[in-house]
Amino acid sequence: MIDQTLFEPGAFPGDISLINWPQNDYVLGNLIGVSEDESQRHIDRAKQLSLSLLYWLQTEAPRPDGGTGFPGLRLRPDIMGTEDGLAKTPYVRESRRIRAEFTVLEGHVGRDNRAAVERLEGHTGRTTQPIVPGLHAAEFPDSVGVGSYGIDLHPSSGGDNYIDFASLPFQIPLGALLPVRVSNLIPACKNIGTTHITSGCYRLHPVEWGIGEAAGCLASFALNENLSPQAIRNTAKHLGSFQALIRKQGVETDWK
């Protein structure tokens, strides 16, 4: 988070890092759908896992000079705002997701899958990414934001290994923010209509922030216009008005 060499001398006593690695991924239980006691037990065990990783870094991690351990590493309660220096709440890498009017699939955003789709359709499409000439993610006419990150999944509790492959700069479709069954709920983060695979690129914080902005604007627009979120997306006039509103506020909805 902080490289002290990029600041005025004395601004920071050292670098500050936020550790979110597979080594401290806790996969031994759920925080939801269980009793409060069980949930807290998993949180406590997850903290111990993080402390174990810190201890390994302090004592056994290989150093460039051939030695082991970085004993100067320490927790920062003053930065985290907690007594123990760990995070205030657990970071949930993959959330539960809604059953949405539209679900983003790997074939919409994965680079290799898009190449296969383009070959099947007999065209190469419009270029939006210079390093991948002629190839672009699926275009969504109801786009309410953009994002760009590779599809990156950590090992799972089911035994799956790393999944890490390229995606293309993509859009956030409004249909992925609309539940099929519930009409008065708008997801505002990584809980939109994606799959286990595509959540790997839509879960990133900048994308979540874009989703949150779109969700807030959608709620406000729906109230002001006395419309349901579904009616806004599924009526061309209302969708156009909503997209014009968010674009006026500086929201980018495509990569053109």
Located regions from the model:
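Flavin (FAD/FMN)-binding glycine-rich loop and adjacent Rossmann-like elements that form
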Residues: 1-256
